[in-house]
């Protein structure tokens, strides 16, 4: 729960730099109803990315909207009905992020997902189609752990979108610079 997470969130907030958090599959303290509260509690220190967007300006003064959601991919554990229910929910959350940013005039997007953008063996998904529809320049994702899983989804450019895996073990626990 949130009370149990306060010490960890406080530690992360105390670290230097901007911290934008995206919900993962183990983040039980955070549900969609708490996003606004979390952003109020940690204003200026942490930003919780869900059903919203974050503005990023690079050194060349290009402005991007950072959008994202947890996402979901099929790993063989779900019934088709349960899988589709979760994907539909996550797709809607991502659309809310894109639409909010677009309504505020943003044209450049960086998309974040916790899960890979496709299930194993898929050549597209609702998430990749949405990245293409809104013109996301980059999709950053994680969740793939262990060498056997690193190739589960896209790496590099596909249909004009750059896909980057940033799972900690894939990066040898070193931060990845994704933009200037």
Model-found features: residue ranges?
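Short, charged, surface-exposed secondary-structure boundary motifs
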Residues: 30-32, 140, 172-177
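N-terminal active-site segment of His-dependent metallophosphoesterases
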Residues: 1-17, 27-28, 77, 93-107, ...
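Binuclear metal-dependent phosphoesterase catalytic core
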Residues: 56-60, 85, 132-134, 146-180
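Short, Asp-centered acidic motifs that coordinate Mg2+ and/or phosphate
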Residues: 20, 108-110, 138
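Core catalytic region of metal-dependent phosphoesterases/phosphodiesterases
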Residues: 1-59, 123-136, 159-167
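Short, solvent-exposed loop/turn segments at secondary-structure junctions
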Residues: 3, 118-121, 148
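Active-site glycine-centered loops adjacent to acidic/histidine catalytic or metal-binding residues
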Residues: 24-25, 114, 142-143
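Conserved catalytic scaffold of divalent metal-dependent phosphoesterases
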Residues: 32-122, 130
